[in-house]
């Protein structure tokens, strides 16, 4: 019988190091779920960033006011500054239950 130890898999992006799957030259390595290795060169990635397709918003986005579309009427500054009234619940000194002695 052989014993093996397990290594926890990072589940959150915060746990991964900054230079994960990169080289000092800026080349980025990735794999697909099928196992195909993909190599992205730094120059190619910078060209993709400045391409017209990268600057075009995606089609068929849902209409969410304030997120994907501008709101029809911007909220007035007074509405933003208004404080919400909070209802205060009176705390009574009554006993919560009766105690037999």
Curated annotation (Swiss-Prot):
One Gene Ontology cellular component: cytoplasm
Main localization, broad class: cytoplasm
Modifications after synthesis and translation: Phosphorylated.
GO molecular function: eukaryotic initiation factor 4E binding
Region described as Disordered: spans on this chain: 1-28
Sequence motif: TOS motif, positions: 97-101
Intervals of motif YXXXXLphi motif: 40-46
Keyword RNA-binding: no
Compartments reported by the entry: Cytoplasm; Nucleus
GO biological process terms on file: negative regulation of translational initiation
Alphabetically ordered keywords of this record: Cytoplasm, Nucleus, Phosphoprotein, Protein synthesis inhibitor, Translation regulation
Subunit structure: Interacts with EIF4E. Interacts with RPA2 (via N-terminus); the interaction enhances EIF4EBP3-mediated inhibition of EIF4E-mediated mRNA nuclear export.
UniProt family annotation: Belongs to the eIF4E-binding protein family.
Function per UniProt: Repressor of translation initiation that regulates EIF4E activity by preventing its assembly into the eIF4F complex: the hypophosphorylated form competes with EIF4G1/EIF4G3 and strongly binds to EIF4E, leading to repression of translation. In contrast, the hyperphosphorylated form dissociates from EIF4E, allowing interaction between EIF4G1/EIF4G3 and EIF4E, leading to initiation of translation. Inhibits EIF4E-mediated mRNA nuclear export.
Annotated protein name in UniProt: Eukaryotic translation initiation factor 4E-binding protein 3
Organism whose genome encodes this protein: Mus musculus (Mouse)
């Amino acid at each position: 019988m052989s014993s093996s130890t397990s290594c926890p898999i990072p589940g959150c992006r915060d746990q991964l190091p900054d230079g994960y799957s990169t080289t000092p030259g800026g080349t980025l390595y990735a794999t697909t779920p099928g196992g195909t290795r993909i190599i992205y060169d730094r120059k190619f990635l910078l060209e993709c960033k400045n391409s017209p397709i990268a600057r075009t918003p995606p089609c068929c986005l849902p209409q969410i006011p304030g997120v994907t579309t501008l709101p029809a009427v911007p909220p007035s500054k007074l509405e933003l500054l208004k404080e919400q009234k909070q209802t205060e619940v009176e705390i009574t000194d009554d006993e919560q239950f009766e105690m037999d002695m």
